[in-house]
């Protein structure tokens, strides 16, 4: 008889490879109108991730699948900023994210002791929760950047895992080889990733390799213990159109592809992050390249923004790029608000950014033929044909805003709106088919 013990199954990918369908896989399958085996197969080979920390599962989180054949997920960024620290305002943003259909919240708090806010968020929200431990490191350890050690950084990662964070953006791909490429080839906007810039600065001052790259296996051990999904951060994403698809971005993407395989081998789930700023005609090719280089891992993108001059309207520039990126293979969109490049977003900015991104994600899902993606659109068509406003609100992504605008401008003719009144085309054709009088209010 063999004395070897079976390896302990901890992560979703562990269970999937053992042929077991977890409750989270079943939940994802039901929500996505897929067979549970469809989900299990793709979790097993890394094409789908279910970011669900074992700690957060015990607190009642909902399971969300990210990846091939699933609906495009949407993330909301928030968190306490040093220049405008207001926890109450951030909780308003959490409520908006939950009420208006976000799938994930990333706590990007970077001021002081952030653990209380993070722990409360994980305790209270059923959505996926992500963080960037590098943002937290300086406040957590109470040290200047260049004094941080590898042990310090990994202590912060472990603290986030213990708290129940479902996915962490960790900039593992920016190693000495990538920074050499960056310094040799140059860029218009240099490095615009906050976490990536901090690591680049640390590497340049200390002369050391990126500890998240050098000690990647140790990082994987922490993530495996809690089933934290690694979201491989793209330190070298383009910060302007000029830098898109350059040698530095591609060099890092190649490194991220290698790290995907190492993570999967260790039983750790992976997502890969992407651009950024990118011209409209380059997006589809970039998505396909990423999927190839990173072995079809779920792709998590920030837009991309399709122009650099939409200041104050970057939720629109990002939604345009997001619709194209998601319809071309991206699986997860990070929202962008009107405040992008300007200031910390307020609650209204969060709502505007979330809705713009949800529209982009939904449009992409229709194009990708995601099961039942168009159902609500068809119901909306039926409701509008009947001029059934109550049904219209039930179909709308944001019924609150739609109903508010409609009621602020009451029409004189029942069933119509003030744009057309009695000249409403839908009303006119309905009357034709009903055989009733077409009264336009202009008759003698």
Feature annotation, model-predicted:
Residues 1-10, 442-444:
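Basic/polar N-terminal segments that are highly enriched at the extreme N-terminus
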Residues 3, 11-15, 20-309, 313, ...:
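Alpha/beta enzyme core
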Residues 3-6, 313, 349, 405:
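Hydrophobic alpha-helical segments with strong N-terminal bias
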Residues 180-204, 238, 242-244, 344-444:
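Catalytic or ion-coupling anion/metal-binding cores of large enzyme and transporter domains
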Residues 309-318, 324-370:
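C-terminal catalytic subdomain
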């Amino acid at each position: 008889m063999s004395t070897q013990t079976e390896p302990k199954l901890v992560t979703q990918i562990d269970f999937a490879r053992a042929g077991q369908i977890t409750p989270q896989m079943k939940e994802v399958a039901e929500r996505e109108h897929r067979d549970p085996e469809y989900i299990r197969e793709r979790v097993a080979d890394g094409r789908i991730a279910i970011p669900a920390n074992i700690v957060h599962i015990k607190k009642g989180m909902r399971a969300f699948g990210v990846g091939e054949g699933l609906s495009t997920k949407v993330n909301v960024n928030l968190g306490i900023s040093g220049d405008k620290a207001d926890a109450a305002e951030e909780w308003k943003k959490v409520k908006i994210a939950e009420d208006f259909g976000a799938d994930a919240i990333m706590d990007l708090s970077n001021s002081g002791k952030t653990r209380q806010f993070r722990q409360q968020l994980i305790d209270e929200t059923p959505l996926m929760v992500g963080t960037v431990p590098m943002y937290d490191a300086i406040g957590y350890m109470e040290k200047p950047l260049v004094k941080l050690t590898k042990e310090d950084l990994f202590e912060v990662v472990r603290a986030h895992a213990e708290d129940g964070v479902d996915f962490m953006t960790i900039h593992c791909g920016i190693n000495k080889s990538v920074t050499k490429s960056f310094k040799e080839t140059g860029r218009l906007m240099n490095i615009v990733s906050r976490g990536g810039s901090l690591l680049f600065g640390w590497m340049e001052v200390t002369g050391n390799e990126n500890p998240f790259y050098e000690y990647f296996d140790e990082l994987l051990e922490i993530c495996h213990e809690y089933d934290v999904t690694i979201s491989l951060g793209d330190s070298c994403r383009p910060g302007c159109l000029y830098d898109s698809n350059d040698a530095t971005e591609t060099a890092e993407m190649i490194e991220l592809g290698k790290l995907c395989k190492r993570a999967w081998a260790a039983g750790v789930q992976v997502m890969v992050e992407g651009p950024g700023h990118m011209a409209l005609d380059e997006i589809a090719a970039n998505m396909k390249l990423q999927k190839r280089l990173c072995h079809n891992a779920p792709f998590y993108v920030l837009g991309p923004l399709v122009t650099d001059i939409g200041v104050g309207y970057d939720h629109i520039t990002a939604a345009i790029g997001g619709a194209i990126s998601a319809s071309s293979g991206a699986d997860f969109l990070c929202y962008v608000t009107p405040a992008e490049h300007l200031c910390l977003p307020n609650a209204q900015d969060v709502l505007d950014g979330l809705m713009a991104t949800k529209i982009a994600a939904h449009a992409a899902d229709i194009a990708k033929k995601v099961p039942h993606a168009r159902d609500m659109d068809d119901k909306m068509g039926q409701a509008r044909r009947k001029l059934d406003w109550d049904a219209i609100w039930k179909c709308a992504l944001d019924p609150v805003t739609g109903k508010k605008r409609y009621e602020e401008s009451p029409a004189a003719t029942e069933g119509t709106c003030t744009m057309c009144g009695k000249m409403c085309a839908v009303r006119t054709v309905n009357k034709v088919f009903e055989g009733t009088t077409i009264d336009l209010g202009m008759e003698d």
